[in-house]
């Protein structure tokens, strides 16, 4: 079954931030189902170029079908940690805009075979790139107690990580934990009772932590962001949509490092303009978007521009 319905978060706000030049070169680093790419392409002339990157084969198949007759579009299957090298391979050395949408696409969440959702029963998987070996099943069934505690604490910021890690180790000693709902049940059974009455799902942060570990998500962000910024043309923009505090902290740290004044304090700043500037503190979904698309609720958009 195909799962291709997806509502792109902060779509218009992101495109406005990019200030798309008709003859510019733009890179969608997380193609998904192409919401950003399609709107960028509408603003490009025949001299413009769009590069679509994704590590998910279903997304790549969708992109190839969508843009099969368009010579202005290049589709590349890779993780964006390889951003600079794959662009260099295509003789692209300078870019006018990059988009990173760090959220899971609806097709990934809604396809039960991918194992991302804690609402649907599926084999534990959670791989963005389905050709890689490490998956959620291996982590849940083979990581030591200490490693489970580490990822739950580091990637989920969970205070009772030891309790759940202990429950997982205990349960898997008698029977392998094979499916998402088996894991959800263990999390519920071993969670503090007050957690079960909170508005957010008790398994949410555990699934987030496992997914981040499976895909090495946070470790590659800083490199990819720095690579993108290093390739910007003057007035080029990097726009990034994050979905949880761990991602947003990395975005802020990288952007602020470029945007801060690096001149010694004793040097007068008359008419001085830093090479990079923040385009905004943060942009969040409108009330209308929140009403229309519940999955946008945690999204934050930030942008950085290269002034010269």
Swiss-Prot record:
Q: Could you tell me where this protein is found in the cell?
A: Cytoplasm
EC assignment: 2.1.1.199
Q: Which GO terms describe its molecular function?
A: rRNA (cytosine-N4-)-methyltransferase activity
Against InterPro entries, the record matches this protein to: RsmH, SAM-dep_MeTrfase_MraW_recog, SAM-dependent_MTases_sf
* Broad class of the protein's primary localization: cytoplasm
Q: Which UniProt keywords apply?
A: Cytoplasm, Methyltransferase, rRNA processing, S-adenosyl-L-methionine, Transferase
Its cellular-component GO annotations read: cytoplasm
Q: Which family does it belong to?
A: Belongs to the methyltransferase superfamily. RsmH family.
What PANTHER family does this protein's entry cite? 12S RRNA N4-METHYLCYTIDINE METHYLTRANSFERASE, S-ADENOSYL-METHYLTRANSFERASE MRAW
Full protein name? Ribosomal RNA small subunit methyltransferase H
What organism is the protein native to? Ureaplasma urealyticum serovar 10 (strain ATCC 33699 / Western)
